């Protein structure tokens, strides 16, 4: 992630930090989210040759809203079984698959996220990132509860 942080410095983003080797960054910028996404996508392609990288930028308020939007009854679940599939496009429409068709796993669609609960583990669920992308018709990236919580802590620091 050192190279990614150097890129952020070169682009004049402030206070850039990465979380582990997850590809997640927390930074300060005057750019709007969509502009930040396109700038990073272009620069990553130019500098590192990764033309198919999709960047998803959320504000502190946006990340807080995602966590706060977790279905209320899910707050009783084991947090290690909760995942957040962040969506590239806000307002993506969910397809026709019913959450009950995948029990004991379940999902709920939010504004820019699909919440996934998989009591038998993410490695065993059919509600993986590919499923979410087919369901919503947009790119997604999935993070577990622990990573999402740590990102919010980094943003709040």
Please annotate each region the language model reported.
Residues 1-157:
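Surface-exposed, charge/polar-rich loops and edge strands
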């Amino acid at each position: 992630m050192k190279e990614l942080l150097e890129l952020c410095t070169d682009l004049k983003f402030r206070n850039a930090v990465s979380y582990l080797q997850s590809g997640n960054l927390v930074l300060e910028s005057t750019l709007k989210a969509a502009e930040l996404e396109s700038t990073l996508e272009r620069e990553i392609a130019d500098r590192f040759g990764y033309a198919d990288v999709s960047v998803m930028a959320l504000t502190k308020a946006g990340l807080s809203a995602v966590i706060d939007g977790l279905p209320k009854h899910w707050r009783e679940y084991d947090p290690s079984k909760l995942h957040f599939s962040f969506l590239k496009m806000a307002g993506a429409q969910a397809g026709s698959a019913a959450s009950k068709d995948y029990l004991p796993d379940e999902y709920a669609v939010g504004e820019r996220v699909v919440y996934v609960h998989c009591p038998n583990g993410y490695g065993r669920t059919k509600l993986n990132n590919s499923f979410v992308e087919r369901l919503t018709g947009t790119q997604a990236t999935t993070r577990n509860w622990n990573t999402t919580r740590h990102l919010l802590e980094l943003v709040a620091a």
